[in-house]
UniProtKB/Swiss-Prot annotation:
A ubiquinone binds at H201. Heme b b566 binds at H97, H196. Heme 1 (or BL or b562) is low-potential and absorbs at about 562 nm, and heme 2 (or BH or b566) is high-potential and absorbs at about 566 nm. This is Cytochrome b. Keywords: Electron transport, Heme, Iron, Membrane, Metal-binding, Mitochondrion, Mitochondrion inner membrane, Respiratory chain, Transmembrane, Transmembrane helix, Transport, Ubiquinone. It comes from Parantechinus apicalis (Dibbler).
Length: 381
């Protein structure tokens, strides 16, 4: 008799995805982040669901309802801290996952990569609307500044911004619809993640060498289930340390004050995971130019497969590309730092040079490095 997990219609899918899946034998810890992102999503959906049971999406009571969750609801403080810091862990894993994809050439699985970029955009949208919900000062002003960017679109901009707001400014209608979006988007993310996996399993995983691994594969379970479990332990340790010992470390002190449309905070800035994009947005004095640069900074990921010029897939044996990759990493960290600084010298000039280097590296230097490495590998005799 056939094993049930191989014959049952539902168990068969799970078996082919997580148990008997043929996996390259040499994938490193950099391949752990996919499963960690899945765990992050589950944590966020569960904590978010329980928070939504006690939250009210009304401008008069939203701030109080969050305080009520932290003070009066059983373990409400823990749910809130896990949810807020879980978002940070989510983005940390996301950035490392995307970085891994760029370094090892995983973007050559174009469908998987493109759905991944759409996933990244959807998660960013979810985090943005979620940040507005506590209705603190930075929630309100962050929403005002970012939604206002829509008004930079020629001709239809102002109408579009007012349509999103549901009025002439960020108000009750905006908060209510943002809560609706924040509730539905994680389920869309879950569906997209399944499609992401579906396309990944069509081709199989890439591996650090970038060479076709078909000749040497092992079953996912128990080898990689145990490896993912170790990664999960580290993730949970980091999340619990953050949520239990310094839950407000990554938050903004302005969010302890209820939203006040008559009082603007001295420095409006988003959460740390958006600072790199915010720095690129601020680096261009023109409003529309800034918005386009902001979009380009993320959407540029979609054209990375077209910019691959090297004969080798992975950067493992390409030292020049490796150097440029780590310069790009340092550049993104610099952008994150600049995004959190006030608009004054020397931050202005650094904030203008860093985005230029960002686009130069991806669009020009890295493709040229690939061509140069091809040339260097050709026999010269």
């Amino acid at each position: 008799m056939t094993n049930l997990r191989k014959s049952h219609p539902i168990l068969k899918i799970i078996n082919h995805s997580f148990i008997d899946l043929p996996t390259p034998s040499n994938i490193s810890a950099w391949w752990n982040f996919g499963s960690l992102l899945g765990i992050c999503l589950i944590i966020q959906v569960l904590t978010g669901l329980f928070l939504a049971m006690h939250y009210t999406s009304d401008t008069l009571t939203a701030f109080s309802s969050v305080a009520h969750i932290c003070r009066d609801v059983n373990h409400g403080w823990l749910l809130r801290n896990l949810h807020a810091n879980g978002a940070s862990m989510f983005f940390m894993c996301l950035f490392l996952h995307v970085g891994r994809g760029i370094y090892y050439g995983s973007y050559l699985y174009k469908e998987t990569w493109n759905i991944g970029v759409i996933l990244l955009l959807t998660v960013m949208a979810t985090a943005f609307v979620g940040y507005v919900l506590p209705w603190g000062q930075m929630s309100f002003w962050g929403a005002t500044v970012i939604t206002n960017l829509l008004s930079a679109i020629p001709y239809i901009g102002t109408t579009l911004a007012e349509w999103i707001w549901g009025g002439f400014a960020v108000d009750k209608a905006t908060l209510t619809r943002f809560f609706g979006f924040h509730f539905i988007l994680p389920f869309i993310i879950t569906a997209l993640a399944m499609v992401h996996l579906l396309f990944l399993h069509e081709t199989g995983s890439n591996n650090p060498s970038g060479i076709n691994p078909d000749a040497d594969k092992i079953p996912f379970h128990p080898y990689y289930t145990i490896k993912d479990a170790l990664g999960l332990m580290f993730l949970l340790l980091a999340l619990l340390l953050l949520a239990l010992f310094s839950p407000d470390l990554l938050g903004d002190p302005d969010n302890f004050s209820p939203a006040n449309p008559l009082n603007t905070p001295p420095h409006i800035k988003p959460e740390w995971y958006f600072l790199f994009a915010y720095a690129i947005l601020r680096s261009i004095p023109n409003k529309l130019g800034g918005v386009l640069a902001l979009l380009a900074s993320i959407l540029i990921l979609l054209i990375i497969p077209l910019l691959h010029t090297a004969n080798q897939r992975s950067m493992m044996f390409r030292p020049i590309s490796q150097t440029l990759f780590w310069i790009l990493t340092a550049n993104l960290i610099t952008l994150t730092w600049i995004g959190g600084q006030p608009v004054e010298q020397p931050f202005i000039i650094i904030g203008q040079l860093a985005p230029m280097l960002y686009f130069l590296l991806i669009l020009v230097l890295m493709p040229f490095a690939g061509l140069f490495e091809n040339y260097m590998l050709k026999p010269k005799w």
